[in-house]
């Protein structure tokens, strides 16, 4: 019998907060392997969040935003007897966070012409207040799953 694998996740987390999810956000924001640039963008965004939020805790705002954006269910396509059905499926925890990172980055980059740090901070603040495009995307995915509840018995 072989040894147990190393498992998922980053060891240790980021430098400032020592948090694994912040390190994963930095990796999600990173383009072309430029990790220092991504780290600066995320830390600047957290500084903006700390100055704009009431309690001044950027990490708490980030965690709340992540929980508000992460989807619980999604639809997956399955072909049954010549017809394709959208089947609602529960989302695994690793995929939940990955989708949340993807949507936050995607909708932050689409915001108006400020710096990426300001756009990311605005999207995270909106998401923590149950607003913003990334929360709308999560609600849209949940609505799709709810509309296709009738096909739940086709589960994989």
UniProtKB/Swiss-Prot annotation:
Tell me where on the tree of life, at the top rank, the source sits.
Answer: Bacteria
- Supply one GO CC term from the record: small ribosomal subunit
Drop me one GO molecular function for this one: rRNA binding
GO biological process terms, alphabetically, are: translation
One Pfam family, short name: Ribosomal_S7
InterPro entries in the record, alphabetically? Ribosomal_uS7 (IPR000235), Ribosomal_uS7_bac/org-type (IPR005717), Ribosomal_uS7_CS (IPR020606), Ribosomal_uS7_dom (IPR023798), Ribosomal_uS7_dom_sf (IPR036823)
What keywords does the record list, in alphabetical order? Ribonucleoprotein, Ribosomal protein, RNA-binding, rRNA-binding, tRNA-binding
Stored PANTHER family: RIBOSOMAL PROTEIN S7
Instruction: Say what the protein does.
Output: One of the primary rRNA binding proteins, it binds directly to 16S rRNA where it nucleates assembly of the head domain of the 30S subunit. Is located at the subunit interface close to the decoding center, probably blocks exit of the E-site tRNA.
Q: How does it assemble?
A: Part of the 30S ribosomal subunit. Contacts proteins S9 and S11.
State the similarity comment: Belongs to the universal ribosomal protein uS7 family.
Please report the name of this protein according to its UniProt entry.
Small ribosomal subunit protein uS7
Tell me what organism the protein belongs to: Chlorobaculum parvum (strain DSM 263 / NCIMB 8327) (Chlorobium vibrioforme subsp. thiosulfatophilum)
């Amino acid at each position: 019998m072989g040894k147990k694998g190393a498992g998922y996740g980053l060891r240790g987390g980021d430098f400032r907060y020592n948090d694994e999810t912040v390190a994963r956000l930095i990796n999600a924001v990173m383009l072309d392997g430029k990790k220092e640039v991504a780290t600066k963008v995320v830390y600047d965004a957290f500084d903006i969040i700390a100055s704009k939020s009431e309690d001044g805790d950027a990490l708490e705002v980030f965690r709340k935003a992540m929980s508000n954006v992460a989807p619980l269910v999604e639809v997956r396509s399955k072909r049954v007897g010549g017809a394709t059905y959208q089947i609602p499926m529960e989302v695994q925890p690793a995929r939940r966070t990955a989708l949340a990172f993807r949507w936050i980055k995607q909708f932050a980059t689409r915001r108006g012409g400020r710096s990426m740090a300001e756009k990311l901070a605005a999207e995270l603040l909106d998401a923590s207040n149950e607003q913003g495009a990334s929360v709308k995307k999560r609600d849209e995915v949940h609505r799709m799953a709810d509309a296709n509840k009738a096909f739940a018995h086709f589960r994989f």
